[in-house]
Regions:
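Glycine/serine-rich anion-binding loops at beta->alpha junctions
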Residues: 76-96
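Active-site loop/lid in soluble adenylation, ligation, and acyl-transfer enzymes
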Residues: 1-70, 74, 78, 82, ...
Length: 259
């Protein structure tokens, strides 16, 4: 396991889980990264609470290749596109845990891009092990158990700063993967990066704690590991994010930018 000492030296803020629609969570990532770049906020971790089922596709993925759009509509899943790369994630209220970290790239200087994923998720692996979950890291960007994938991470890098976020399956109807994500099906578009086919191994296979209880445990783990102080989203950050939802993240021009 690789870990940069500089990550430990940052003065972290922790934004506890708060519920928002899927497009709003995407917009908040961009707003908070831009605030960090502009010097309006320090390094932070934000925990998400999902308020609706969502299919979250990576920035460089084709909607047609990745998502069964008819199935998504029938099952009530919102399709949204994040600013970072990586594969498609199924996210559901009370079943999915997500966190985002916003930090200067200097904190992961001296280690490779691949190693930065493990360094930034090392605390989460330890948090799961504390719950007797047999978790470990698999390059490039997965937290796993001996039975499959628990979580996947993705990054975006902008102007010397990093957005790193990780999505964790607390519980899941594994049949949804085949219904909603077009892994293994024929390409409908020549564009875009495909998701990898991996067995899912939810945390609920190993712990009786609820999704909210695991989230609270992870927040405490991060606080203890990094001496983080609790913070909150400001009214101006929320207002700016709502504006980005309207002008970008909820628009077909963004969601279908790689058809």
């Amino acid at each position: 396991m690789h870990r940069s000492e500089a990550i430990d030296e940052l003065e972290w803020e922790l934004i506890p889980a708060s519920g928002h629609p899927a497009h709003m969570h995407m917009a908040l990532d961009e707003v908070l990264l831009d605030r960090l770049i502009a010097g309006g906020r320090g390094p932070a971790i934000r925990f998400w609470e999902w308020t609706e089922p969502a299919l979250v596709i990576g920035s460089h993925q084709s909607v047609m290749n990745e998502v069964d759009q008819a199935a998504a509509r029938a099952l009530g899943f919102t399709i949204t596109r994040r600013m970072s790369g990586g594969g498609t994630m199924i996210c559901e209220p009370a079943r999915t845990i997500t966190y985002s970290m916003y930090l200067p790239m200097s904190a992961v200087a001296g280690i490779s891009f691949r190693q930065s994923y493990a360094a930034l998720d090392a605390w989460a692996v330890r948090s799961f092990v504390d719950l007797s979950v047999p978790a470990s890291y698999r390059e490039i960007n997965d937290i796993i158990s001996p039975r499959g994938k628990i979580a996947g991470a993705a990054q975006a890098r902008r102007k010397g700063f990093v957005l790193h976020h990780t999505t964790i399956a607390h519980s899941m109807d594994v049949q949804l993967v085949a219904q909603l994500i077009r892994i293994g099906r024929d390409r409908l578009s020549e564009r875009g990066v495909r998701s990898a086919e991996k067995e899912v191994s939810p945390l609920s296979w190993f712990t009786k704690l609820s999704c909210a209880e695991v989230t609270a445990h992870m927040e405490r783990s991060f606080e203890a590991a990094f001496a983080a102080r609790r913070s909150a989203l400001s009214p101006s950050e929320l207002e700016q994010a709502r504006g980005l939802v309207d002008t970008k993240y909820a628009t077909p021009g963004w969601i279908e930018r790689l058809p």
